[in-house]
Amino acid sequence: MKTTHFNIAKTYAEPVTTSRLGIEIGQKIGLIDATANYVTDGRFDIGKFSKLHRQLTVVDGYSATVDIEELMRGGINVVVQAFGPEEEYVRSEPDSDPSIEPPRGLRSWRPYFEGTELVERIEIAIAEHQSFAKAYEDFIEIAENGNDISRIVASGKIAMVLMLVSGFIADSIAVLNRFHELGVRVMCPSHLSATSWADSSAELNDPPGLNDFGREVIQACEEIGVLVDLAHCSDYTCKDTLSIATRPVIATHTKVRNITNSLRDMRDEILRGVADTGGVICVLAPTGRTQQERHLARLSRDQILTKNYADPFERARAKLANAQVWATKLDLSTIDHVVRVAGIDHVGLSSHAQNVPQWIEFTESLITHGYDEREVGKILGGNVVRVLQETIG
């Protein structure tokens, strides 16, 4: 099957493919991360949709790749599509261990692009997603508010909510407003690289997590209707955001630090804080490699790409073809933990583009595990839809 990939380092092309469902649809848009473990499995087909699964609104709280056919096979109705500038791993301390707090002020990550070019690249990415949705409007549509989500899902199409994966807004509220006008409805202050106004859990790790401008950004997001994502912010950034939040926030993709011992995952204290805002924590649905294994794989990959591709454009394109894949299952133990800590009304799921077709089995997995139908509906999407409706309008 022919596939076409898009990201901010690649201009829009005409994607055409004939799917296994016998319909012509655009196959993919977005990034394939080498830690995303994306796989397809022929076992999952539309004929196996359970009655309950079909009745639910199923939400993928964080996807780096939108594949229409795979979403349909997985029974997913709403996808939060993350995009942004590629970031590269440029420094690691000897024998670095992600369970050990990095030195304060350490810079380990950087985006491929800077300044006005970075903003332009983000605008290109938004345009690519809009073009993709327009080309396949019979199957997918961008949602800009809660009413859009309800309408699109009711029509039988997939609702796509655009998310800026890191707060690269050129230190400008005007740029934030511009991105909102173009359709961005979710934003993480920092992902891998710390921004000038917010620390990430991967580097810096210095109080305060938000500076004065960062606090202005959070307030502006609440005013214009951009849902704030704390998934990979530092503890300090999370605490500072939670201390001023007046609307629900989200963690679009995380595990639990009490289980993984990884600084990239959230502490119970932060999980409770997100719940206290009325927000939702989206558990990375699949199990997979340990954080240390991903950490070392990323470093090796980006060092090789930096050596082989001097041009950032070519390096970003090469990264797309470097996905590592392996099979995974629903991470029930982490879901149980977040339910205990934050409550059933504050738990969701996300794929990070991993094994989307397997979502068709999640309803049965959760019920067999002991959750009732009402609880399954909340976990699979009801909680995320509520938070989106309360924040983006």
Language model feature labels by segment:
Residues 188-191, 196-273, 282-286:
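Active-site core of metal-dependent hydrolases
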Residues 1-204, 261-393:
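N-terminal hydrophobic targeting/anchoring segments and the immediately downstream early-domain regions
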